[in-house]
């Protein structure tokens, strides 16, 4: 007997689940709440879609209550199989130091090859169909929308998380999972900018620079450190290095306090920077101190650094003594910001938290206590770093769920 599989959600994991189920012989229907499929996929990687990552330790890079679960799922459908899958759909890819993108550099190419395969496999796609209720009746799953009740043998929930609700991820999948008896770890924004104190921040909005950002608990205890592009905003700091650290803040208790220590000189040593500062100050005696810093820092950062270091904006290099040079070095090396929180679900790229994995089988993605109910993607309590890790989770979990839902 041919199984009828219904997939809730036409995002990355949902499209993969539907294709895997159809290739395994099932009749497949996708229900999508939005007016077109793959809206979030189109904006991933700033519209370029970082498909996966060839990091050899990728399967161990995920967060959540049970990282071993994610590792087990990823190993069933690793990045190598993801590349084979997309190459088989006619998508050329390019590898940039392990970060894999479509050769066209366009997320739309990824979505189009997926939708072409959906059409080839005669998978039905019902758009603008928001699921209101799921329930078991007469040995089948019933999926109720405002317009229809769809019966199916297996149901795969790929409804997404709460992040970027404008793309369709409004968090409604958590309620559907809860209605089936599953627990949900409270979602928090992840891969998101940090909110910080500082009146000077408005003057730095839009400034980008290379930096190492260290997250401190209580201003003293290092939690984690990341290096990369830092973007200053009117409300705090952003950029990939900040995104990687943000989950530690959003997942912490409200009573915990954090600070960011920013090294604006990474990877240069103290001796290298001191030598340059001394040499340039000696050569530019009649110039303002800012002249020495222009080859080191973005222009808008210079007055902020000088103020933090206690050096008047109008001071000339002739007045720059060893103590002042040390103050400049220290301020650039350990610029402190008090963190007040993170941006919200509208802004974050991912959620930490989600459906509790302990109720699922990592071999099949099926709920152990509720037969025929499967899960994949962001809805689950799995989140990874920037760089293709989270799309790989979508491909892997979607593939495993789809294949087993069809059996």
Identify the residue ranges that each predicted region occupies.
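N-terminal Rossmann-like FAD-binding beta1-loop-alpha1 element of flavoenzymes
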Residues: 3-30, 401-406
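Short hydrophobic core segments
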Residues: 6-8, 31, 131, 150-166, ...
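Feature captures the FAD/FMN-dependent oxidoreductase FAD-binding
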Residues: 76-154
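An anion/pyrophosphate-binding glycine-rich loop and adjacent beta-alpha core
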Residues: 35-37, 42-43, 51-58, 92, ...
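Glycine-rich loop(s) and the adjacent beta-strand/alpha-helix scaffold that form part
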Residues: 154-200
């Amino acid at each position: 007997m041919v199984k009828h599989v219904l997939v809730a959600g036409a995002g990355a994991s949902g499209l993969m689940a539907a294709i895997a189920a159809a290739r395994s012989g099932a009749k497949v229907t996708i229900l999508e709440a939005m007016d077109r499929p793959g809206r979030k996929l189109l904006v991933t990687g700033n519209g370029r879609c970082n498909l996966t990552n060839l990091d050899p330790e990728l399967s161990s890079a995920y967060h959540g209550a049970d990282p071993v679960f994610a590792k087990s799922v990823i190993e069933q459908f690793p990045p190598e199989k993801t590349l084979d899958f997309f190459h088989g759909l006619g998508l050329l890819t390019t590898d940039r130091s392990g970060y894999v993108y479509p050769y066209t550099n366009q997320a739309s190419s990824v979505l189009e090859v997926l939708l072409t395969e959906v059409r080839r496999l005669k998978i039905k796609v019902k758009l603008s169909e928001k699921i209101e209720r799921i329930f078991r009746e007469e040995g089948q799953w019933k999926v109720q929308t405002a317009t229809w009740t769809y019966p199916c043998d297996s149901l795969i929930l790929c409804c997404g998380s709460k992040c970027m609700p404008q793309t369709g991820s409004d968090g409604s999948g958590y309620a559907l999972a809860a209605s089936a008896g599953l627990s949900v770890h409270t979602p928090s924004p992840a891969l998101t900018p940090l909110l910080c104190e500082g009146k000077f921040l408005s003057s730095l909005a839009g400034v980008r620079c290379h930096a190492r950002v260290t997250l401190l608990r209580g201003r003293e205890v290092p939690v984690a450190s990341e290096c990369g592009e830092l973007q200053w905003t009117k409300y705090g700091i952003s950029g990939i290095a900040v995104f990687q650290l943000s989950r530690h803040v959003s997942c912490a208790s409200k009573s915990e306090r954090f600070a960011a220590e920013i090294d604006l000189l990474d990877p240069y040593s103290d001796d290298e920077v001191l030598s340059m500062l001394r040499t340039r100050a000696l050569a530019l005696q009649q110039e303002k101190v800012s002249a020495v810093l222009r080859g080191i820092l973005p222009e808008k950062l210079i007055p902020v650094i000088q103020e933090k270091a206690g050096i008047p904006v109008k001071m000339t290099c002739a007045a720059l003594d060893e103590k002042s040079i040390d103050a400049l070095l220290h301020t650039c090396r350990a610029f402190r910001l008090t963190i007040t929180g993170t941006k919200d679900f509208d802004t974050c790229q991912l959620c930490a938290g989600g459906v509790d994995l302990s109720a699922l089988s990592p071999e099949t993605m099926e709920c152990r206590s509720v037969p025929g109910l499967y899960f994949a993607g962001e809805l689950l309590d799995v989140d990874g770093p920037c760089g293709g890790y989270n799309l790989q989770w979508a491909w892997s979990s979607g593939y495993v769920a789809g294949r087993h839902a069809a059996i």
